[in-house]
Amino acid sequence: MEYWFRYGVTEIPIEVSEEISCEKISLYRGFEVDYKILSEIAGEVGRKSGEVTILYDHEHQTQLELLRSLLYEIQSQTSLEGRVKIIFSSWRTSPRIVEEILKSSLKGFSCKIEYVEDCKKTSYTGLKTPVDVLESDTRILVTSILPHGLYRYPSIVNSLIYSKLIEKEEDVDVHSILEDKLQILGLCIVGEKTYLDSLTNLDKSSIIEAEKIYTVNLEPVDILIADAWGWPWDSTLESTLHILRLVYKGVREDGMIGLIAECKEGIGRREFAEKLFKIYEENIQDSYIEIVREVLRNRRVGMVTTLPRTLLENTLHIKSFDTPQEFLKYSLRIYSKNARIRIVNGPILIE
């Protein structure tokens, strides 16, 4: 039986003999734009003459489709020229990659695009926020919710903080400021649906819905092979390691996890790379390194990746492979052909 994994911008296969017990779970989901919701927003923008600021916290491709559809809908009702500015960030993947994606995907729209770290910011009732947010008539957040190994299901407000679209300077009620004073409207994808609401209501309803969609209870198997969702999530080692915590409960103690992640852009941020190379020289504290340590206490981990084998094996004790087939051959030598195997595609949190 042949199975496929997302790997960068492409897919790579694995062949599992029918003699071996193997099951597959996939939570890649389709997405249909809710134009009724987008028309409602566009109508609101059309009734006003001031500027529009869209805060965009990038997480996945369907979210980009939602942003494009929103801009099309606004453009069909009013001119975008000089009115719309997109302030973007992403704490999940490289902002440089997100910038390339946005500029390529939004070429046909007359809107400004700026990375949040390059924005002029100011203090406002205990928060530090881009000046454009304060000066706009309409403020929209385009976001989504997927499971993450560090935070399970991060709230929308916490995601804004992680991505530095807002920064807390004082101990204040962030929800109240964003909703009552700044009146930021939230447009959020969860699974196949789009939700439009206040940030407070979205935080409650969207996390509950995401948990229903992406959290599953599964019996542990001997070998679990999971992709890291493809580009841009698997662009660096740093951005993929959280997957281990999402899936490790689906593997028995002393079992083995295979993570399929291209890591085309290398290790990740310089700060993370420095910690990785000093991992045995001093008491390194890093959330992603701790995930690996936690999983390796009673499980084996291998990676199919372009990263050098010696890098992974000498720092994190993760064995590296060139193909999923090579990983499978190695793991079956350890667990035999009687091993139970699980293939995992897409965002999933195994309990």
Protein language model regions, located:
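N-terminal amphipathic/basic leader segments beginning at the initiator methionine
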Residues: 1-37
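Short N-terminal or domain-adjacent regulatory/targeting segments
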Residues: 22-48, 72, 205-215
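Short acidic-hydrophobic, aromatic-tinged amphipathic segments that line or gate anion-handling sites
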Residues: 30-37, 112-118, 318-327
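A general structural motif
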Residues: 33-37, 202-218, 235-242, 283-285
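N-terminal active-site beta-alpha-beta segment that forms phosphate/nucleotide-binding
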Residues: 37-104, 225, 238-274
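C-terminal non-catalytic interaction/assembly regions of soluble proteins
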Residues: 76-79, 83-88, 240-241, 245-351
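A glycine-rich helix N-cap at a beta->alpha junction
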Residues: 98-121, 280-282, 287-298
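Conserved, well-structured core segments that form the ligand-binding/active-site neighborhood
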Residues: 108-220, 225-229
